[in-house]
């Protein structure tokens, strides 16, 4: 019924994950937005996910490790009772969309590959309101949380520079 469709849409969120190629190089960015009106719980999830992204970006400096980024992201979301997906991670990016190193949204400070000036990476927290367990849908592409609770996803492409992280996909 129309009422059921409206109820489904009213508190829904949707992630838009886009990749573009320019002059042979890839850029990758994602944002999760409400579909129409959303409730306070979803609004908080969206806010915390974006803030966790920027906590991770602050760690994207030469000499730090991918573990520093992941630790910053996970440490940011945990006090809210949220979790991060472990099956999907950020990544290096350049001529190919997915390059080394992998950038998990969890980790131990000082562990994993060291970041070097000139690297370009994608940091992309995928934050769940509940558990991090996921189910891949029959189409082989769609993914939902096993507990049915909402998840949000934000991403930016970041250049590692001597002057700090440079966000290459910053939106106005």
Language-model-derived ranges and their functions:
Residues 1-9:
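Single conserved hydrophobic/aromatic residue that forms the stacking wall/gate
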Residues 10-12, 118:
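Loop/turn positions that initiate beta-strands
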Residues 13, 19, 125-126, 163:
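Short, surface-exposed secondary-structure boundary micro-motifs
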Residues 21-27, 38-114, 120-132:
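Conserved, well-structured core segments that form or line functional sites
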Residues 27-43, 134-149:
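Short, compositionally biased
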Residues 156:
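Acidic-aromatic/histidine active-site loop/patch
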Residues 170-172:
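The conserved catalytic core of RNA pseudouridine synthases
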């Amino acid at each position: 019924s129309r009422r059921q469709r409206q109820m489904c849409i009213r508190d829904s969120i949707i992630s838009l994950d886009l990749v573009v190629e320019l002059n042979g190089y890839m850029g990758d960015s994602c944002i999760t937005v409400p579909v129409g009106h959303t409730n306070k719980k979803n609004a908080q999830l969206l806010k915390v996910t974006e803030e966790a992204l920027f906590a991770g970006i602050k760690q994207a400096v030469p000499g730090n490790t991918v573990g520093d980024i992941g630790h910053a992201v996970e440490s940011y979301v945990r006090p809210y009772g949220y979790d991060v997906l472990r099956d999907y991670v950020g990544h290096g990016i350049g001529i190919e969309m997915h390059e080394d190193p992998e950038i998990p949204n969890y980790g131990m400070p000082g562990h994993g590959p060291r970041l070097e000036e000139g690297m370009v990476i994608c940091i992309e927290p995928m934050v769940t309101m509940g558990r991090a367990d996921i189910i891949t849908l029959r189409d082989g592409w769609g993914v939902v949380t096993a507990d049915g609770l909402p998840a949000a996803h934000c991403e930016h492409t970041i250049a590692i520079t001597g002057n700090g992280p440079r966000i290459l996909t910053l939106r106005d």
